[in-house]
């Protein structure tokens, strides 16, 4: 083995990606939009999929304004037929499929005692069904048109460090398990499957809820780095895991949280009680 054996090329140029949940309000950078923009900047052709066509179309506008190649497709990704049609749309437009980035998800703030059964089922459905259906039809398309492929599923640090989000935590934990199962099942076919677990990131979905400056400051202080994450941070992790730079990585969960998950839950009170010099 010599230095010439390694090619410093991420292998993204000319490839095709489906980014599920690639829309975002206005010009904000959500996890999916961040990944889509970064992939397009690396030469990947991107199909932006969102239930709201206006949000998907805006992501396409942002990509094409930078000289990238993208198209949008509106779909309810909890519906199997619409997921199948999404994969067909990517093949019809771009002729191949290499990557799948699954960002779709919703949350609910309740304990198991408080949770409404209908909400429980809906949270599980929206977080898991799009991954299942898009992978069901996407993996055969990758094998047929590209000979290999890569998938990134978006989980959450809530799956690692649970909070009062029982349905969401359960769904995101299941995504990690599903990722590992898919990685084992499809490795012989050249398909890598990994997971990104975001921590507190400031995205359009978050600030649409009216997060206060004080709440944002608390989030920053929860990180040992003292900073807040963005959709760009998650998008960068997705791009890495889809690239050839991650060719030897599969079945793994990359935690992108500024170190929040390695800290004691009582860090703030501990710091408050620490003697001052």
What role is predicted for each listed range?
Residues 2-9, 239, 250-277:
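Short C-terminal tail/terminal secondary-structure segment
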Residues 8, 195, 214-245, 249, ...:
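C-terminal helical subdomain
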Residues 10-47:
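Canonical Rossmann dinucleotide-binding motif of NAD(H)/NADP(H)-dependent dehydrogenases/reductases
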Residues 15, 68-72, 96-97, 142-155, ...:
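Active-site loop of short-chain dehydrogenase/reductase
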Residues 111-112, 116-124, 219:
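Substrate-binding pocket helix/loop in short-chain dehydrogenase/reductase
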Residues 140, 184-188, 247:
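Alpha-helical segment proximal to the catalytic Tyr-Lys
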Residues 152-174, 179-188:
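Catalytic loop of short-chain dehydrogenase/reductase
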């Amino acid at each position: 083995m010599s230095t010439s054996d390694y090619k410093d090329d991420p292998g993204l140029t000319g490839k095709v990606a489906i980014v599920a949940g690639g829309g975002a309000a206005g010009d904000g950078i959500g996890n999916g939009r961040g990944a889509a923009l970064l992939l397009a900047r690396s030469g990947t052709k991107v199909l932006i999929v969102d239930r709201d066509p206006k949000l998907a179309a805006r992501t396409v506008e942002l990509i094409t304004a930078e000289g990238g190649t993208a198209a949008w497709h509106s779909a309810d990704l909890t519906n199997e037929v619409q997921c199948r049609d999404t994969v067909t749309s990517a093949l019809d437009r771009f002729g191949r499929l290499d990557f799948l980035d699954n960002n779709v998800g919703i949350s609910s703030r309740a304990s198991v005692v408080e949770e409404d059964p209908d909400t429980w089922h809906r949270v599980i459905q929206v977080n898991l069904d799009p991954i299942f259906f898009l992978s069901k039809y996407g993996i055969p398309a990758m094998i047929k048109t590209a000979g290999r492929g890569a998938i990134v599923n978006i989980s959450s640090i809530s799956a690692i460090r649970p909070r009062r989000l029982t349905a969401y935590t359960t769904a995101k934990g299941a995504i990690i398990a599903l990722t590992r199962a898919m990685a084992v099942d499809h490795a012989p076919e050249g398909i890598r499957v990994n997971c990104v677990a975001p921590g507190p990131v400031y995205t359009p979905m978050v600030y649409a809820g009216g997060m206060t400056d004080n709440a944002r400051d608390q989030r920053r202080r929860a990180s040992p780095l003292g900073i807040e994450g963005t959709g760009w941070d998650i998008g960068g992790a997705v791009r890495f895991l889809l690239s050839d730079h991650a060719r030897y990585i599969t079945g793994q969960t990359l935690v992108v949280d500024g170190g929040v998950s390695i800290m004691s839950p009582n860090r703030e009170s501990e710091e408050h009680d620490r003697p001052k010099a």
